[in-house]
């Protein structure tokens, strides 16, 4: 008896193709049926932001276009708009007041544009925002006024910009924020006042910044933090920085300049994972203490084979986790 699997696969593919071809993407001035509330205008040849979106529109996507500016009235008359996707365009700035009269807007994607700055009160009337990706732009400064009315915000993406410092209390109104991505910027120093107010923060991504200094108690007021990435920074010392973070599930310290380290936390969560790879470790009694702590607390180590000794000379290039205690710490 011949298998019916190929015929079933063909049937499924045909059904999927039919469904795809039947899906019509509407963009003004093309008229849309009254039940259509989502509009997609993603033509690479589009140079001007479309006009004529109906008041019932709930989602508008104008992405992967040549659009470089929006008029201050571009989004007026859209009281039901919930999602606005403007990524992968050529936007350089936005007019103040652009997002007024959008009481239901919860998602605003401005990623992958050419934004160098934004008006101080650009998000003042966007108080319902939950998701705000500003990643992959050219922002060099953060203005605290941007975030003063975003009390509902949960996810903020500021990665892949040119931010050199975070103003004091910049995020202190973001009481509900759970995820903050500041990776691939130019931060050199971290201090407690930079992250004040982020009482519910669970995920903080700081990797690929030239961070050389972390002021004591920087992370002491973020007990809910479960993911912290400082990968690919320039850290040489992290003594005591993470002790209050008892709910940590992932701590990524890979690709730094660490030669030695005390156990990063006293009390660990049941499923803590740790990445120590890519550092120039000194394979001595201090490292043995760290690895003993890892084993005793059942810590999961990522990339064990890349935890390599840089010193002493007779251990250089050796995998630290494969060495016996009597070799590393013979005393």
Curated annotation (Swiss-Prot):
Gene3D superfamilies found in the cross-reference section: Ribonuclease Inhibitor
LRRCT domain residues: 279-330
InterPro entries named among the record's database cross-references: Cys-rich_flank_reg_C, Leu-rich_rpt, Leu-rich_rpt_typical-subtyp, LRR_dom_sf
Signal peptide annotation: 1-23
Glycosylated residues (UniProt): 35, 125, 232, 271
Record's GO cellular component terms: extracellular region
Primary localization class, coarse: secreted
GO molecular function: phospholipase A2 inhibitor activity
Positions of LRR repeats: 78-101, 103-125, 127-149, 150-173, 175-197, 199-221, 223-244, 245-268
Source domain of life: Eukaryota
Stored SUPFAM superfamilies: L domain-like
Location of the protein in the cell: Secreted
UniProt keywords, alphabetically: Glycoprotein, Leucine-rich repeat, Phospholipase A2 inhibitor, Repeat, Secreted, Signal
Family classification: Belongs to the beta-type phospholipase A2 inhibitor family.
Subunit structure: Homotrimer.
Primary role: Inhibits the enzymatic activity of the basic phospholipase A2 (PLA2).
Protein's name in the database: Phospholipase A2 inhibitor
